[in-house]
Amino acid sequence: MRCGKSRRFQPALIIALLVFLCSSVAGQDFDVIKNKVKEHVLGNGMKFIVLERPDVPVVSFHTYADVGSAQEVSGITGISHLLEHMAFKGTKTVGTKDFGVEAALLDQMDQLYAQLSREQRAVNPDSAKITALQEQFDKAKKAAHELVKVGEYSDMLDEQGGRGLNAYTNSDATQYITSLPSNRLEFWMAMESDRFLNPVFREFFEERDVVMEERRLGVETQPTGKLVEDFFAVAFKAHPYHHEVIGHMSDLRRITRQDVQEYFRTYYSPSNLTVAIVGDVKAEDVFTMADTYFSRIPSAPKPERLRTEEPEQWGERRVTVEAQAQPMLVVGYHRPDVNSTEDLAFNAMANIFGQGRSSRLYKILVKEKKIAVDAGSFNGWPGKKYPNLFAVYAVPAMNHTSAECMDAIDAELVKLIREPVSQEELGKYKRQTKKGLIDGMKPNSQMAQTLTFNDVVRGDWRKTFDAVKELETITMADVQAVAAKYLAKKNRTIGEIVPEKEGAQQ
């Protein structure tokens, strides 16, 4: 999500910005970089990770909230993503013309909406009462909107030279990013701490409508979106990876501002937040300011890790979406989480098997057999923190079917199980991945993201710098072993988009 006003950067500006945000790590030993990273945990449990890079006067900020759609329960699915939208609406002092008056109107709206919702869902709803309540609600909503300074939070950051303000939610986390000139460090501290200390979820109903429209456009009118939603629901019977980040429409319609406030109090406690700051700063300055600004946020226990585990699958599952759309095939095999000792082998297998035009799947299905226009594989679907899926997909070519693609995929999977990958394939994967790891450390923003991910999900930001050494330990036997262990038919779910049957909509 990009908050505030829409902007389109010209290519030249994008290139300039990337250069501006980059610091070269070429030729530096990873241990040298690792030794420059410092960490500090506030008394309330909030953690700050800092990497000093004085090359250019810019600093990137990455705030990682350890909460995603996997934390949601029935009735509030989609609330993590909705809260991400609400997090840019301002505070008691930012985004309002008169908070005292506005606060009273927001409370009035909450009360009216609760009454309206109860009456609408009553066994015998009173239509006259519903109409009266709706009129009162609309009047309060209009009055509250007139007090809003729309987009003030993002405008204030832009005025201070901010770039790349964004946020996104997935199954595992919600993350907030931006970059500022390095002499605006304290400005960011004041703004970000106020956002978590004094949030005001104004324009809630307007933003909820925006999210509902996202669902309509991305799921309810898109066969691919519908396939993904149904696929997760079938592949995961117990674990909350079974629902999409966007949530169910019936839940979105009924989520209240109080629901969001309660969710925020639970999952945005300081102990559940990790911040990485990379750029032209001094770690001691960062820690001093963090103590001043963020220690104001009251401490609270870190939410308990999810208890529910997905049970072993005992047989192949299938899901079909009928639509007048491009046919598609997706297959998912259950696999362990990112902290498993087998994760490295899974990554190598996904790359060799189905990533890029030189991968096995693409060469066989697209180039040689010409039964697909695209094919590939990937890991970590829909998340990485908990056991997830190794996925394979194919888009059948005209006059060809998903069944043909599935047969060809199965034939290649058998080879993967019975025969080790070649030394050439594994060597190519290691070289490409090593380059990607090094390149990924260049942009300040990407480095900040990697540090927070490794610290929260993998348990220690230092693992960022172990990746290349770990890469070298993968063997051909490791890849063959995970293929043989996990790529069984009884461990998979198959999803398809197929042509809609004649008369289906009549």
Regions found by a protein language model. Give the residues of each.
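Bacterial N-terminal signal peptides that target proteins for export
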Residues: 1-14
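Bacterial N-terminal signal peptides
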Residues: 12-24
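Non-catalytic beta-strand/loop surface segments
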Residues: 26-71, 96-183, 205, 217-272, ...
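Active-site recognition of the HExxH zinc-binding catalytic motif
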Residues: 77-85, 89
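A common structural junction motif
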Residues: 194-201, 294-301, 410-421
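C-terminal soluble interaction/assembly domains
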Residues: 459-465
